[in-house]
Amino acid sequence: MKNFSLWCDFIENSFLDNEFLNLLSHEINGATSNPAIFKNAILNSPIYKDKILKLKGKKTKDIYEELAISDIQKAADKLAPLFYQKNDGFISIEIDPRLHDNTTLSLGEAKRLYSAIGKENVMIKIPATKASYEVMYELMKNGISVNATLIFSLEQSQKCFEALNAGLVEFRKNNIALKEQNTRTPQAVISIFVSRFDRLLNPKTKEQNRIGILNANLAYNNIYSKNEPNIRALFASTGVKGDNLPKDYYIKELLFENSVNTAPLDAIEAFKGKMDFKKPLMNFEIYTALNQIISQSEREKACNDLLSDGIEQFCIAFEDILKAL
């Protein structure tokens, strides 16, 4: 499979005991969550109602964390065989998105969540903001796996890699007797968001549904060229809205070696068994194609707007959960 890994971009308590097990038997190798996913699960699934009632009286964020941590622990246990046998099998949980501009609070929350979950195969999701690169470095340095998220620009992907790799180097330096200590080297993914580009820019361009693919290919090339197997490109935001594209479009178009794709359930269902690997375009081919579709200044503005919007959406989802609890 050329070191390609397909993850499930969904989590919900009863799902983990049923459909998720079926997905694991069909080569799903990991899972991701975010505030919007937890909002949908906690506010719409009846399985959480009794749990919430038992936790009444606690602070709303504490209630949320107990629910989320329980689900993450369950997912981590289901994925544990993949983690120990194939060095995959990760589940991601995001820190409070409202901390995105505070390095100290983000780092403290990330370490606290990782400790509370108590599972090696958990990745802590950190948004790729200016305040967060130091957080990524410190987590990797301390042996905590990281999912760097909300990446839209090549600059973001480069800064994420630099921070993650620097932490990885420090971890290895500090753990020379790695095998004797039975300590696993942390892993990281750099989550490049894809379809959001196209949904934003399709109305402005003649060539539809290509900018997200080309932009993701560019970031992938940058990460892959570093030749660090413990830091992989992950393609996120790979769901299709509407009926104008196949549901698995953003999986098939980015089927690159040594990469991860986290996809919604309908995309996974449509994709089953179609391992037709793509050869990534070279950078000069990507820039030629991009420049024919849209200007560099418009792409840069889109990157900035999408990052701001992504953070805002996750903050709103997080606040909605807390208000409902």
Curated annotation (Swiss-Prot):
EC number: 2.2.1.2
Protein localization: Cytoplasm
Superkingdom classification of source: Bacteria
Record keyword Disulfide bond present: no
GO molecular function, one term: transaldolase activity
GO biological process: carbohydrate metabolic process; pentose-phosphate shunt
Annotated catalysed reactions: D-sedoheptulose 7-phosphate + D-glyceraldehyde 3-phosphate = D-erythrose 4-phosphate + beta-D-fructose 6-phosphate
InterPro entries according to UniProt: Aldolase_TIM, TAL/FSA, Transaldolase_2, Transaldolase_AS
Top enzyme class: transferase
This protein's pathway: Carbohydrate degradation; pentose phosphate pathway; D-glyceraldehyde 3-phosphate and beta-D-fructose 6-phosphate from D-ribose 5-phosphate and D-xylulose 5-phosphate (non-oxidative stage): step 2/3
NCBIfam families given in the database record: PRK03903.1, tal_mycobact
Xref: PANTHER family: TRANSALDOLASE
Recorded family membership: Belongs to the transaldolase family. Type 2 subfamily.
This protein's name: Transaldolase
